[in-house]
Amino acid sequence: MKKIMGVILFICFAVLLVGCGNKNKYHATVYTNSNDILTEDFLFNNKIKKVEYNVKNEDGTYQKDENGNYKTVMDNDAPEERTFIVKDNTTLSTMVNSNKVTVDFETQIVVVNLFFSYFSRDLFISSIKFKDGNAKFKIYDKTKRGYKDSSGPHARYAFIIMDKLDIEEATFSYTTKEVW
């Protein structure tokens, strides 16, 4: 009986240790395209390589060709990703749709990464490492085995609100985790 109680106590202690880890020590939250945070104009003015963008008229409507199809433009000289470190409301207001996010820049910072993707899955933060002004973000999405959810190429973004750090440079790596 003492052995059984010892094993149960050990398992409880092990679960407690694992559960108390501070996986999100910077209180980071990631938002994606589905949250409709960034404006179309901001995305159009910060193109990503391999992505087609609809062309707008001055009145905000989309241009069409003689066949009625939307005119698109692709910038193959654009970078494959873009990263923005936002430290004030003035900069943020040029990027976001109004009332989509609230950021307290006294205690928080925003990091945005635009990238090319075939998928529109939700994104999750695996880890954030910060050293000497450099932040390294590991981001993942989830897919089900055998589930086909790809789409046409499009620009995606990871919009991260987190504790204020003195970030000068940010790098991102993306992976997919397969779930059952």
Give, region by region, the residue ranges found by the protein language model:
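Sec-dependent N-terminal signal peptides of Gram-positive bacterial secreted proteins and lipoproteins
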Residues: M1-N24
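Exposed, flexible binding/inhibitory loops of compact, secreted disulfide-stabilized domains
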Residues: C20-W180
